[in-house]
Amino acid sequence: MHRDSCPLDCKVYVGNLGNNGNKTELERAFGYYGPLRSVWVARNPPGFAFVEFEDPRDAADAVRELDGRTLCGCRVRVELSNGEKRSRNRGPPPSWGRRPRDDYRRRSPPPRRRSPRRRSFSRSRSRSLSRDRRRERSLSRERNHKPSRSFSRSRSRSRSNERK
């Protein structure tokens, strides 16, 4: 029988399998709780499996008993499958497509736009010293012929003046 034809309450998701997902070990562990229809272990990407039971009560017992146990060398997450297929491209969840575009814009700008603005804003604030202070710095650099030292000194002086 095909793995998608089982009712959801018979289908169990097994997560956190790592790369060592072993069909035989899963069949043995889950078969203890009742007859299985099938066991499917993901290979690309690895790390999860689906186990189908004949009876939904057996699936519920397996979830209750095996969640958090060690199988195939890993502490696994076991839960009833919710039936949603995940896309391989790991794009935005399907619910994002349902939201009207105008509504999304009203809530907040996209994250990509927000962080460069924040950065440029903080830069402009840190550079917004008065023109007199900028002149003071450039004059002290010319006098001392050691730009890095005089720059750091004048910078620390201006900070201490602001605090007082």
UniProtKB/Swiss-Prot annotation:
It holds the Pfam family RRM_1. B- repeats lie at residues 119-133, 149-164. Keywords: Acetylation, Cytoplasm, mRNA processing, mRNA splicing, mRNA transport, Nucleus, Phosphoprotein, Repeat, RNA-binding, Transport. Residues 107-128, 143-158 have a biased composition (Basic residues). Residues 119-164 are annotated as: 2 X approximate repeats, basic. GO terms for molecular function: mRNA binding; phospholipase binding; primary miRNA binding; protein-RNA sequence-specific adaptor activity; RNA binding; sequence-specific mRNA binding. GO terms for biological process: cellular response to leukemia inhibitory factor; mRNA cis splicing, via spliceosome; mRNA export from nucleus; primary miRNA processing; regulation of mRNA splicing, via spliceosome. Its main location: nucleus. The modification Phosphoserine is found at S5. Residues 10-83 form the RRM domain. The keyword Acetylation applies. The modification N6-acetyllysine is found at K23. Residues 81-164 are annotated as: Disordered. Phosphorylated by CLK1, CLK2, CLK3 and CLK4. Extensively phosphorylated on serine residues in the RS domain. The keyword Acetylation applies. It is found in: Nucleus; Nucleus speckle; Cytoplasm. InterPro entries: Nucleotide-bd_a/b_plait_sf, RBD_domain_sf, RRM_dom, SRSF. Disulfide bonds: none annotated. Residues 129-142 have a biased composition (Basic and acidic residues). Gene3D superfamilies: 3.30.70.330. PANTHER family: SERINE/ARGININE RICH SPLICING FACTOR. Splicing factor, which binds the consensus motif 5'-C[ACU][AU]C[ACU][AC]C-3' within pre-mRNA and promotes specific exons inclusion during alternative splicing. Interaction with YTHDC1, a RNA-binding protein that recognizes and binds N6-methyladenosine (m6A)-containing RNAs, promotes recruitment of SRSF3 to its mRNA-binding elements adjacent to m6A sites within exons. Also functions as an adapter involved in mRNA nuclear export. Binds mRNA which is thought to be transferred to the NXF1-NXT1 heterodimer for export (TAP/NXF1 pathway); enhances NXF1-NXT1 RNA-binding activity. Interacts with CPSF6. Interacts with RBMY1A1. Interacts with SREK1/SFRS12. Interacts with NXF1. Interacts with YTHDC1, leading to recruitment to RNA elements adjacent to m6A sites. Interacts with SRSP; increases SRSF3 binding to specific exons. Belongs to the splicing factor SR family. This is Serine/arginine-rich splicing factor 3. It comes from Homo sapiens. The lineage of its organism: Eukaryota, Metazoa, Chordata, Craniata, Vertebrata. The gene is SRSF3.
